[in-house]
Amino acid sequence: MEEFHKVRRLPPYVFEQVNRLKASARAAGADIIDLGMGNPDLPTPQSIVDKLCEVVQDPRTHRYSSSKGIPGLRRAQAAYYARRFGVKLNPETQVVATLGSKEGFANMAQAITAPGDVVLCPNPTYPIHAFGFLMAGGVIRSISVEPDESFFPPLERAVRHSIPKPLALILNYPSNPTAQVATLDFYKDVIAFAKKHDIIVLSDLAYSEIYFDDAPPPSVLEVPGATDVTVEFTSMSKTFSMPGWRMGFAVGNERLIAALTRVKSYLDYGAFTPIQVAATQALNGDGSDIAEVRAIYKRRRDVMVESFGKAGFEVPPPPATMFAWAKIPEKFRHLGSLEFSKLLVEKADVAVAPGIGFGEQGDDYVRLALVENEHRIRQAARNIKRFLSSADETMHNVISLNAHR
């Protein structure tokens, strides 16, 4: 049978190669320290779990829910934006609950993309930013990920040389995988650019609450008039350690939110109602749960930066997110990130995410997730130190993928 058209358009999912190797090593008895997938290990706060258990006892909540999210949940998200960013949103027309931000992004692509539409997407970036539009028939044009003045000249060229004119610009700050953070001044320039060229802005703000200094990352919607052209996506997965609950939001421009809501109405009935009620309680909380999660990730970040640095693997301290973006040690860089990641599993019992999985501009890097405790992170550093010190004896039979390019 011939491969299906949409499946054929998708690039290989390179993370799966590392996952298979990791599973094989574990089956053979290896203790793999997994810094690869950004899958939080922290428990969901007990008060949120308790609310779920309470509400699930009511059989009325076992029926179909609302695709756009129950009213109380949408009001809670609007209230969060007002508290955190000073942004006023209408919960009826500017907020929709999604099954995680990933689903929201993919369905927004389905809602707004015509075959051949050009989308400006950072490289490297989280895969759904590009893949969602590829599956919807769009064309990706890669742009820089640095949120500074160097971002705009290539953007202007992309607009001039793209036929048709780009439909949308994707932003992701704090960035997954690079952990870079944007400023409000940068966002002001982005909105001015988008309005000048009549381009939609889609902002992924999944890591807004995971930051490690006294400057909370801003929302692009803080820019006056941003809702004229912008939708922003958030997630409860990292903020409240709720990845398996699948709860996120899209907020912003009424026309775009209406389009997403309509597409979703054909595809799902929303999250299980008790999950939505528990999420409402989380959003209406005093913020102490968020502060505790943030503090744990900061301690893990500091341990990783220190211990990996002593091991000979320099890891720049990320200012935000639950990830570090580290350049592959120079003697291994010629291998590319996929082969280096495989080596770490085989020789050091450590799993990381190869940078190539986030775009070709990431191939000199690996992403390290802060999803193991401090003891395990130090153990990973010791394993890597042993691997690096013995690499000259073990590398003679490793062939670089780049040698065949």
UniProtKB/Swiss-Prot annotation:
Protein location: Cytoplasm
Entry keyword set: Aminotransferase, Cytoplasm, Pyridoxal phosphate, Transferase
E.C. no: 2.6.1.-
InterPro entries in the record: Aminotransferase_I/II_large (IPR004839), LL-DAP_aminotransferase (IPR050881), NHTrfase_class1_PyrdxlP-BS (IPR004838), PyrdxlP-dep_Trfase (IPR015424), PyrdxlP-dep_Trfase_major (IPR015421), PyrdxlP-dep_Trfase_small (IPR015422)
One Pfam family linked to the record: Aminotran_1_2
Broad enzyme group: transferase
Modified residues (N6-(pyridoxal phosphate)lysine): K238
Family: Belongs to the class-I pyridoxal-phosphate-dependent aminotransferase family.
Quaternary context: Homodimer.
Protein name per Swiss-Prot or TrEMBL: Putative aminotransferase AatC
